[in-house]
Amino acid sequence: ALIPTAACTTDADGVVVIRGNRILAAGDKASVKIPAGARESKCSGGFVTAGFQNSHVHFVGAAWDDAGKKPAADLARELVAMLTRYGYASVFDIASDRDNTLALRARIERGELAGPRILTVGLPLFPPNGLPIYLDHLPREFLNRLPQPATVAAAVAVVGDNLAAGADGTKLFIITPQARGLQRMSAEIARAAVDESHRRGKLVFAHPTDIDGVAASVAAGVDILAHTTHGVETPWPDALLKRTISQGVSVIPTLQLMGYELKKENVPPAVTQRLVAASVEHVRSFAAAGGQILFGTDVGYMSDFDPTEEYRLLSKAGLSAMQILASLTTTPATRWKKFKTRPASTS
């Protein structure tokens, strides 16, 4: 088997030593000690990589309801369909019913069902009266639980409660589309939420919506933009691009999402192509200038689980195969400093 790495090296005569469901060693045949009596399986023509991380997923919808009690076989089937069949060994859920997602994670960690390592931001923060129109399809009971802090103190309390409950980060919706216009999170509230998260050693995601949202996110000190600026045809200003990169802000492009959303709205193909191309150019400029890309697809919100189109669009944005592999493996591992705890997957 070939064992490629994001550093562009490949073990052409690679071997993988597996005991039970754990990988004990992987590398060149000459350097890996094979235990006596091991059964050998030929895997010529295949590839083995580090387990992938999808840094933008959501455990929302009927498939995940009551995850603490739902039959394990049902949940395992959904995890395979949405995630593990595509090589995701780790996922970051960046908005869901926190307690339900934590219950799902606990069952995986107890060994009740096979699934990826789950990180979650739990309940995201929105501007006051700022739930976006594209969440209207979700149950009212869930929407009523989504925090919309109106003061700095309230935002700090929400972040503290969320992280204390077991969340692994914070997500801010900086600007949200409404039926009429946009709703914006105040700079003071955004900064306070970021500062409290950082004080507790956690990273912050932001949903920017547009270029003003990117600027506000960067000014607040967020760590990761959950999307590029879909639907925006103008380039990011050079000064904003440079500041975003100099502050170490990562971007999760979610390029496949743009076409998915426009198809739902029956937007003419020519318009869709133009808007998707604009998103691709935003990512091209960011990556070419040295910006850090994290792979993510928004599955869970998006019902098209197959990431093939995301790979194609990232390639169109100028990322090499090894850069895309890095965005799935070594880059998130570096970002979360989890080199020694990340599982591996094969394909």
Kindly label every feature range from the protein language model.
Residues 51-57, 91-92, 118-123, 170-172, ...:
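Hydrophobic faces of well-ordered beta-strands that scaffold small-molecule active sites
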Residues 2-15, 28-31, 235, 320-326, ...:
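Acidic, glycine-enriched loop/beta-strand segments at the rims
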Residues 66-114, 146-168:
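Alpha-helical scaffold segments that flank or form the walls of functional sites
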Residues 199, 273-347:
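His/Asp/Glu-enriched, well-ordered alpha-helical/loop segment
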Residues 7-49:
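Histidine-rich, glycine-flanked metal-binding segment
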Residues 103, 154-228, 232-251, 273-292:
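Histidine/acidic residue-rich metal-binding segments in metalloenzymes
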Residues 59-74, 129-149, 176-184, 229-235, ...:
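Acidic/histidine-rich helix-loop elements
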